[in-house]
């Protein structure tokens, strides 16, 4: 399998993972914003940390997807 084909395959996997990450961020954010009176509990139990980590993972995933797109298009 050549590099472009591998990049396309990896891009597909990351695309699926990206959708899952976006859903996780959406649901966590919605839950946290819907319960502002629980802010102290969220902080104490680390739910805000989970949300922040998910956002960082989203950013990293997008960066890698961009790299894989360039490879698949023969620009890298």
Swiss-Prot record:
Official protein name in the record: Uncharacterized protein AF_1102
């Amino acid at each position: 399998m050549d590099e472009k084909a591998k990049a396309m395959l990896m891009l597909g996997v990351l695309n699926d993972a990206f959708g899952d990450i976006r859903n996780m961020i959406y649901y966590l954010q919605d839950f946290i914003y819907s319960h502002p009176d629980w802010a102290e509990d969220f902080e104490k139990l680390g739910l805000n940390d989970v949300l922040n980590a998910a956002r960082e993972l989203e950013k990293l995933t997008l960066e890698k997807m961009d790299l894989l797109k360039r490879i698949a298009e023969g620009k890298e």
